[in-house]
UniProtKB/Swiss-Prot annotation:
Biochemical pathway: Metabolic intermediate biosynthesis; chorismate biosynthesis; chorismate from D-erythrose 4-phosphate and phosphoenolpyruvate: step 2/7
Organism (species): Sulfurimonas denitrificans (strain ATCC 33889 / DSM 1251)
UniProt keyword Nucleotide-binding present: yes
Gene it is expressed from: aroB
High-level lineage: Bacteria, Pseudomonadati, Campylobacterota, Epsilonproteobacteria, Campylobacterales
Protein name: 3-dehydroquinate synthase
Keyword Chloroplast listed: no
Enzyme class: lyase
Length: 349
C-alpha cells in the first residue's frame, strides 16, 4: 500500500543584489540585526540610521571563525524567542561571511524558516558568501558541515563598509574573486592581472563581475547538484587547512588561496593544467599578499579529512581542478597515489 504526495510546485527564491549606497529599509515587522563586536563598533550606528522597523533588536556575537558554532547559533535563537519573533519577522545579517552564514542558518531553522537579508561588510562576503543561500556553522569535524540552503530576500552591497577593512581581510576577498575568474572567466582573470583593486572604481567593477558570475551559476544550480560545485575550487584543500589550524592561523580567503595552489598542483599532475598557468594564478594571489605555501603537519590525517568534505562519498574524494584558466573539471577520478604525491610535496615544505 502506498500514499503518494505530489510536491512539484516551484518556489520562487528570486532576489535582487543592490550595489551602491545602502537605501533606507522599511519593515512592518520585528527585525533582529545580527552582527559582531568589531562591525558593531565601526558601522552599527550607520546601519541603524537606515532601518525603520516595528521593533528593532541587535544581537552582537564574538568576532572570528572560531565562534561559528552551535553556541553562537543558540545566542541568536534565544534572542528571537525572548523577543517573540514569529514567522513574519526578519533577520538582517550585518557582517562578513561568518555572520552571514550563521544568521542565515538561524533564519532557516527558527520556526522552520523566516526571512533574512544580507548586508555584507567584507569584500569576501560581498563577492561570494552573501549570495547563493548557503548557510551553516562549523563543528569539530570540519567547516560548514551543519547547515541548510536558505536564500536571502535581498542583498545590499555598500562599498562604504570596505573603507575600514584591514589589509588581510581585503586580500581574503580578492582570493574569492580570483577563484571566480579561474573557474569561469579567462577574460576576467586577465582583467585582474592588469587591475589595481585598491582603486575604488576598479574594485567596484571587479565586485560587479564576480557577482554576475556567481548569480549566473546559482540561477542554473541553486542547490549545488552540478555546476555550482565548481565554485568550491580551492575549498576542498582550503577547508582542511582551516580545520587543521583550528581556524586561527588563516582567514577563510587565505586558506582558499592555499587550496587553489594545491588544486593547481594536482591539476598539473593530472595533465589538466600547464605549469605556466598555475604560476600566473600564484602570482596574482601573491600580488595581494595572499599565502601560497603551507606545510601539512600530518599528511595521512589531511588525506582522511577529505572524506568529510560535502562533495565526497565514502569511497571517493571529489576535487575541482582547473583545465587551464577559465574552466574547471569536477572529478572523483583522482587515484590515491596522485593525491598522496601532492600532499607529500606540501608536507615537505
Amino acid at each position: 500500500m502506498q500514499v503518494h504526495i505530489e510536491l512539484k510546485k516551484v518556489v520562487d527564491n528570486s532576489y535582487d543584489i543592490t550595489i551602491g549606497t545602502l537605501p533606507t529599509l522599511h519593515f512592518d515587522t520585528k527585525v533582529a540585526v545580527v552582527t559582531n563586536s568589531t562591525i558593531s563598533a565601526l558601522h552599527l550606528e550607520y546601519l541603524l540610521s537606515k532601518i525603520s522597523a516595528k521593533e528593532l533588536y541587535v544581537v552582537t556575537l564574538r568576532d572570528g571563525e572560531e565562534y561559528k558554532n552551535q553556541q553562537s547559533i543558540d545566542t541568536i535563537l534565544e534572542a528571537l524567542f525572548e523577543n517573540r519573533f514569529n514567522r513574519k519577522s526578519m533577520i538582517i545579517a550585518f557582517g562578513g561571511g561568518v555572520i552571514g552564514d550563521m544568521s542565515g542558518y538561524a533564519a532557516s531553522i527558527y520556526q522552520r524558516g523566516i526571512d533574512f537579508i544580507q548586508i555584507p561588510t567584507t569584500l569576501l562576503s560581498q563577492v561570494d558568501a552573501s549570495v547563493g543561500g548557503k548557510t551553516g556553522m562549523n563543528n569539530r569535524y570540519g567547516k560548514n558541515l551543519v547547515g541548510a540552503f536558505h536564500q536571502p530576500r535581498a542583498v545590499y552591497i555598500d562599498p562604504h563598509f570596505l573603507t575600514t577593512l584591514p589589509p588581510r581581510e581585503f586580500g581574503a576577498g580578492v582570493a574569492e574573486i580570483v577563484k571566480m575568474a579561474v573557474t569561469f572567466d579567462k577574460d576576467f582573470f586577465e582583467f585582474l592581472e592588469r587591475a589595481d583593486l585598491s582603486k575604488p572604481e576598479i574594485l567596484q567593477e571587479a565586485i560587479k563581475k564576480a557577482l554576475q558570475t556567481k548569480a549566473k551559476v546559482v540561477t542554473q544550480d541553486e542547490k549545488e547538484q552540478g555546476i555550482r560545485a565548481a565554485l568550491n575550487y580551492g575549498h576542498t584543500f582550503g577547508h582542511v587547512v582551516e580545520n587543521e589550524t583550528a581556524y586561527k592561523e588563516f582567514l577563510h580567503g587565505e586558506a582558499v588561496a592555499i587550496g587553489m595552489v594545491m588544486a593547481n598542483e594536482m591539476a598539473i599532475k593530472m595533465n589538466y593544467m600547464f605549469e605556466k598557468e598555475a604560476l600566473r594564478v600564484k602570482a596574482l594571489l601573491q600580488k595581494y599578499n595572499l599565502p601560497t605555501t603551507y606545510a601539512i603537519k600530518d599528511v595521512k590525517a589531511f588525506y582522511e579529512a577529505f572524506f568529510l568534505d560535502k562533495k565526497s562519498s565514502d569511497s571517493a574524494i571529489t576535487f575541482i581542478l582547473p583545465l587551464g584558466i577559465g574552466d574547471v573539471v569536477i572529478t572523483d577520478k583522482v587515484d590515491t597515489g596522485t593525491i598522496m604525491c601532492v600532499l607529500n610535496k606540501f608536507g615537505k615544505q
